A protein has these predicted regions:
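NAD(P)-dependent short-chain dehydrogenase/reductase
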Residues: 139-189, 194-196
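Catalytic helix-loop patch of NAD(P)-dependent Rossmann-fold dehydrogenases
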Residues: 69, 76, 80-84, 104-152, ...
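Adenosine-cofactor binding site in Rossmann-like domains, unifying the SAM/SAH pocket
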Residues: 21-45
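SDR active-site strand-loop-helix element
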Residues: 6, 30, 55-59, 96-102, ...
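Mid/C-terminal beta-alpha module of Rossmann-like enzyme folds, strongest
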Residues: 179, 200, 207-253, 287
Length: 291
């Protein structure tokens, strides 16, 4: 299988390439310097030259606060750029897997107490320009490719590559000065480790299953609880992790965050594919890989 990956230098693109390499796939990694998704001609030219069987569109502008301050760029890259990649995939007859986000939801949760998880069939309602631009990308991909597209929503994506919350907390856990670390405790979701996400996405690509899928590791928690678990996994003192309300963070963040964006992998369970493992096991695997 010949696979083209956008966001080739990002944490998910790098992990996905490793999974594909181990499976014997022919992988072409495209960083922004190789393929500018906001430029339609660039997308058509590069994809046309590579002629992949599958396009993994992991490239995006994921700076949530940056998107809030520059919404034009957010929609150009995340929404229109996804249209360009879908058009390019259609021209060569490739399947496309688009990586979306839990930020397409408003964060009020489901159920009477608002603590329930979102399924693929719950209505989205993004509260930030980042979330709206990612939802726009979903619409563009579905409109262009229909059943030749698979949309994967992931939440709190972390892993051994790139810059992410897990690696930041692991570095702080290993800080010999032992300073306290403040972490938000009023936002809940599910971590998604790239090692597990990449495996499931490749299965979806090979199975040629279309539609929308939530793919996150099982088990909801707060950012503070996640940080504390990372400290414990690293053998550090978890009491150094101090809870703080998101509204009390300084400097104030421009973009609102969903208070509860727990994803229910309902479609994945119903598809017959292996379910995502718990985040606890994925966490210890990731710590072992880096320490």
């Amino acid at each position: 299988m010949r696979v083209l990956i956008t966001g080739g230098r990002g944490q998910l693109g790098t992990e996905f390439a490793a999974v594909c390499d181990s499976a014997g796939d022919d992988v072409v990694l495209c960083a922004h310097s190789d393929l500018d998704v906001s430029d339609r001609d660039s997308a058509l030219q590069v994809v046309g030259a590579v002629h992949p069987d599958v396009v993994i569109h992991a490239g995006a502008w994921t700076n949530v606060d940056g998107c809030e301050e520059d919404p034009s760029r957010a929609y150009l890259v995340n929404a229109l750029g996804s249209r360009h990649m879908a058009e390019a995939a259609a021209l060569v007859g490739a399947r496309l897997l688009y990586v979306s986000s839990d930020y397409v939801f408003d964060g009020r949760g489901t159920g009477p107490d608002g603590g329930g998880a979102y399924t693929e069939w719950d209505p989205p309602g993004p509260i930030s320009h980042y979330g709206r631009s990612k939802l726009g990308g979903e619409h563009e991909v579905a409109a262009v490719l229909g059943p030749a597209a698979t949309i994967v929503r992931a939440s709190w994506v972390v892993g051994r590559y790139g810059a992410n919350f897990f690696k930041t907390m692991l570095r702080l856990a290993n800080d010999r000065e032992g300073k306290p670390v403040t972490v938000v405790d009023d936002q809940r979701g599910c971590p998604t480790f790239t090692a597990d996400l990449a495996v499931v996405m490749r299965r979806l690509a090979v199975s040629r299953i279309p539609g929308l899928f939530h793919v996150s590791n099982e088990g909801p928690l707060s950012w503070h609880e996640f940080a504390s678990a990372i400290f414990r996994a690293a053998g550090a003192d978890a009491s150094r992790v101090v809870p703080i309300a998101g509204a009390d963070l300084r400097p104030i963040r421009p973009a609102p965050r969903p208070a509860s964006s727990i994803l229910d992998n309902a479609a994945l369970r119903g598809s017959g594919l292996a379910p995502m493992p718990s985040w606890e096991g994925a966490l210890y695997d990731a710590v072992a890989a880096l320490q």
